[in-house]
């Protein structure tokens, strides 16, 4: 096996940086601009660029592993072809890197943001997020937002509470990724700091209406790609589950975007590239933006609010409240046989335990659960039944 000497790795790293500076757009984020909260000598050695290290750290995190059993839209359904969150983040990464390549942006940073953007999502998707947010709010720790939790998890919970020491640009892109908000144009707000990151996280916890803008073009691309990745995929899943028919799609949107996931993704990506190339912003054309907005409205009414996927929400909400109260009580009474100790706190550092109140600890534990792990913690006679479709 050939072993590289440190000198060879140094030369390789210099060559990669030189190539990056020559090939990327003047408004791309160079790897040399990456800023960590704590100086990290280990990430500066070897041949990997700084944002590539971030992507690797996220990919090898325990939280990333749990994507495999977290709901995207449809839960309590046995169907091997329905999208789960692990596939969603891969689709976001692929679509965003494709756009970024044609815009001359940093694909390593795009990949890191994409892979980490949903780390903080609860079990049972946005319904679970809403239930946990109500519990957090009533227990005095602010609203729960999965984008805020994603940053918190990667920065303060992973690695026994030490976090992964990711770059500011990566964490900012994750925080500002909100794909549910419709934007025709996104232009980055540059020159942010870790102090501003903390302020934006706090503001978002206290006010759901706060709108955040990424600090990099790469972050803006991921935010647009988030929507591109799910809009057609959710339609295909809903058709597969016989909740809608392809002929139900709004004609105005179909005329511009097509009626299959493949054509929708292709047309949206092409439009973004055409309208963003060599610009300081990322944008859709007005026509495509309007068609996408109509399609999002259709998905909301016919898929996300469909009674067929909402029939267990009352029970799941009750189970969230039951577990939240149980774990609070277990911490207060120091019930060390409880899973919140054996499955979580026993693996966390003293710094994490001392710097988080019991309500925040319970929030972090529940938010990190997969769908099946959550259900296994509930009384067997209260667990909703899985459907085979």
Indicate where each model-derived feature is located:
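Acidic, glycine-rich active-site loops and adjacent beta-strand->loop/helix elements
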Residues: 115-119, 136, 178
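A glycine- and small-aliphatic-rich helix-loop capping segment at beta-alpha/alpha-beta transitions
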Residues: 125-138
């Amino acid at each position: 096996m050939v072993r590289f000497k440190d000198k060879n790795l140094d030369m390789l790293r210099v060559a990669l940086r030189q190539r990056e500076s020559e090939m990327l757009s003047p408004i791309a984020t160079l790897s040399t601009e990456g800023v960590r909260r704590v100086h990290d000598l280990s990430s500066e050695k070897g041949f990997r660029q700084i944002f590539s290290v971030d992507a690797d750290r996220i990919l090898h995190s325990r939280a990333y592993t749990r994507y495999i059993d977290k709901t995207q839209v449809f839960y309590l359904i046995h169907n091997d072809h329905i999208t789960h969150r692990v596939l969603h983040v891969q689709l976001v990464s692929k679509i965003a890197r494709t756009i970024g390549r044609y815009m001359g942006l940093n694909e390593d940073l795009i990949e890191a943001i994409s892979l980490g953007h949903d780390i903080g999502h609860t079990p049972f998707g946005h319904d679970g997020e809403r239930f946990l947010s109500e519990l957090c709010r009533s227990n005095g720790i602010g609203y729960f937002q999965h984008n805020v939790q994603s940053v918190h998890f990667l920065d303060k919970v992973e690695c026994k509470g030490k976090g992964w020491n990711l770059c500011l640009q990566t964490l900012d892109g994750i925080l500002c990724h909100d794909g549910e908000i419709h934007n025709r144009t996104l232009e980055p707000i540059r020159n942010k700091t870790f102090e501003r990151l903390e302020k934006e996280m706090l503001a978002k916890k206290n006010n759901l209406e706060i709108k955040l803008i990424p600090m990099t073009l790469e972050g803006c691309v991921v935010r647009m790609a988030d929507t591109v990745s799910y809009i057609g995929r959710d339609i295909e899943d809903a058709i597969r589950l016989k909740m809608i028919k392809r002929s139900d799609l709004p004609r105005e949107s179909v005329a511009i975007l097509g009626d299959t996931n493949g054509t929708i993704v292709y047309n949206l990506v092409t439009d973004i590239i055409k309208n963003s190339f060599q610009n300081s912003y990322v944008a859709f054309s007005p026509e495509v933006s309007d068609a996408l907005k109509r399609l999002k409205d259709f998905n909301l009414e016919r898929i996300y609010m469909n009674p067929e996927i909402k029939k267990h929400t009352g029970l799941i909400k009750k189970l969230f409240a039951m577990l939240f109260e149980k774990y609070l009580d277990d911490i207060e009474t120091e019930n060390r046989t409880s899973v919140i100790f054996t499955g979580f706190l026993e693996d966390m550092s003293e710094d994490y335990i001392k710097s988080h109140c019991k309500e925040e600890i319970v929030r972090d534990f529940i938010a990190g659960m997969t769908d099946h792990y959550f259900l296994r913690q509930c009384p067997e006679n209260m667990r909703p039944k899985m459907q085979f479709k």
